Regions:
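N-terminal alpha-helical transmembrane segments of multi-pass membrane transport
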Residues: 1-89, 99-106, 117, 441-462
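Membrane-interface loop-to-helix entry segments
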Residues: 36, 44-60, 166, 187-193, ...
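Transmembrane helix-loop junctions in multi-pass membrane proteins
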Residues: 47-52, 91-95, 177-190, 211-225, ...
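Flexible loop linkers connecting adjacent transmembrane helices
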Residues: 50-75, 97, 103-106, 119-161, ...
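Extracellular/periplasmic helix-exit of transmembrane alpha-helices
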Residues: 124-136, 242-258, 272, 302-305, ...
Length: 462
């Protein structure tokens, strides 16, 4: 019953709403989410006058902003939290899923989401800063789409409201999404360790949940652990992927050719059609960089900034690095392996087989260990996101915060034993619904973020 419902909602959100015929008999399938995301990204890219390119130095500079309050987060720390979820699961499992379903051409779709998604990420993160509030439970600040949607409705209706329907729907969708991601995490880790060390799924699932419980049920552990783990694991993973690319430099032009040939239908891709290829890439690009979905603003709101724009610049930088740099590295690891060795494989089997080709047994063990660490960072990151949404729905009390953490741990356990396709569908449904509710408000509320950008640039010119 639940599986059937999830599949139907998934088809509505991600299924082909429009079919455009293309030369050669192929078709371009466009889903509801793509119809929302791509025009929104283009619109804000134009309105910000190509901010990701113009203000790239400002993005880097914003990372070193210092915080003044003890319990608040610096801009760099909020980037660490959002990067934990982006670089964690999205760059490994998300890229694997995109290429498994859509072939090499899906990588091009992911690049598209990053280029235009950076501007969307800037707008939503800036709004999160504008409408943040003090967090009486954890200290510091909290906010996100549920809060700036609420503020927009109050401003329009000119009266105070306890709850706003769209904000409630967004918060619930977020909790569904993050429960789905929890299952993807354990599903991928269990599969990886089974391939690397022949550990039965039930044993690895129990260990994963037990270690996660020790961390997440402590009040102040999340950001501290992420501060330690994320920079180290990202640098190590990046170094290994660069090594593999250098080892296969001669094959690199062929990989680029394959990406573009499959993306534009010149070569038959795994999913069979031009539309399906781009669909998978764009969908996984969203899952990876989160631009437009409303996830990262939950972290951006926690930053202590002297100007809201700086939080937006940090998150725009995160989208660029996440997809253009790190996602591409993962894609190249798989695509630089001989096609005959990875044909027919999916999930972590595909990535581990590719790593074994490049680095032998060490590659398999490295990916298993990396995925374990990435998964923990992702799990901690999504629980950080969930804080503000749980608080919006249930108020300031520890009972509801703890209850959601326990629910997430249960989902982590179920995911270790569930079917691969279903756990992805649940996450896709949640992030799809979040995106709809978020983007509906981004157009009218985005004007305030654009006004802040003008003030920021005016101040710079003085």
């Amino acid at each position: 019953m639940i599986v059937t419902l999830i599949e139907k909602v998934y088809s509505f959100l991600w299924g082909d709403l429009v079919q455009i015929p293309l030369p050669g008999g192929s078709t371009l399938g466009i889903s509801l989410l793509i119809i929302l995301l791509i025009p929104t990204g283009i619109y804000f890219t134009v309105r910000t006058r190509f901010l990701p390119i113009r203000l790239f130095p400002d993005m880097v500079q914003a990372l070193v902003e210092k915080k003044q309050e003890k319990n608040s987060l610096s801009s760099f720390q909020t980037l660490i939290v959002s990067t934990a979820t982006r670089v964690g699961m999205g760059n490994l499992v998300g890229v694997v899923a995109a290429i498994s379903a859509g072939g090499a051409g899906a990588v091009f779709g992911m690049w598209v989401t990053a280029i235009i998604g950076s501007s969307t990420a800037f707008i939503e993160a800036t709004l999160a800063q504008l409408y943040k509030e003090k967090d009486p439970l954890y200290g510091g600040y909290r906010g996100g789409p549920a809060y700036y949607i609420h503020a927009y409705v109050e401003e329009k209706q000119k009266k105070k409201r306890n709850k706003v329907v769209i904000s409630v729907l967004f918060a619930i969708s977020g909790l569904i999404c993050w429960c789905g991601i929890s299952q993807v995490i354990s599903n991928s880790v269990v599969s990886s360790f089974k391939n690397a060390f022949s550990i039965p799924p039930i044993y690895m699932t129990v260990v994963l949940v037990a270690v996660a419980a020790v961390i997440v049920l402590r009040k102040d552990a999340t950001v501290k652990i992420l501060d330690m783990v994320v920079p180290v694991m990202a640098v190590c993973y990046f170094a290994i992927t660069i090594l593999i690319i250098v080892m296969n430099l001669g094959s690199l032009p062929g990989v680029f050719a394959r990406i573009f040939e499959e993306a534009f239908g010149f070569r038959q891709a795994a999913a069979g059609g031009f539309g399906a290829v781009l669909m998978n890439g764009i969908k996984r690009g969203l899952f990876s960089n989160e631009a437009g979905s409303g996830s990262a603003p939950c972290a951006a709101a926690a930053a202590e900034c002297d100007q809201p724009v700086k939080a937006g610049l940090v998150q725009a930088f995160g989208v660029f690095v996440d997809t253009i740099v790190i996602c591409s590295c993962t894609a190249f690891i798989m695509l630089l392996a001989p096609e005959e060795k990875v044909t027919g494989l999916s999930g972590m089997d595909l990535l581990q087989t590719a790593m074994e080709h490049h680095l032998g047994r060490f590659g398999v063990i490295f990916i298993a260990a990396t995925l374990f660490l990435f998964s923990f960072s992702t799990f901690l990151g999504i629980l950080f996101y969930a804080r503000c949404n749980v608080a919006y729905l249930f108020g300031d009390n520890w009972a509801s915060q703890t209850a959601y953490k326990v629910l997430a741990l249960v989902m982590l356990f179920i995911g270790g034993l569930a079917a691969y396709t279903f756990v992805w569908d649940l996450g896709d449904v949640g992030i799809g619904l979040m995106t709809i509710f978020n983007i509906i408000i981004l157009y009218p509320q985005g004007e305030k973020a654009l006004k802040e950008l003008k003030e920021y640039e005016k101040e710079k010119r003085k």
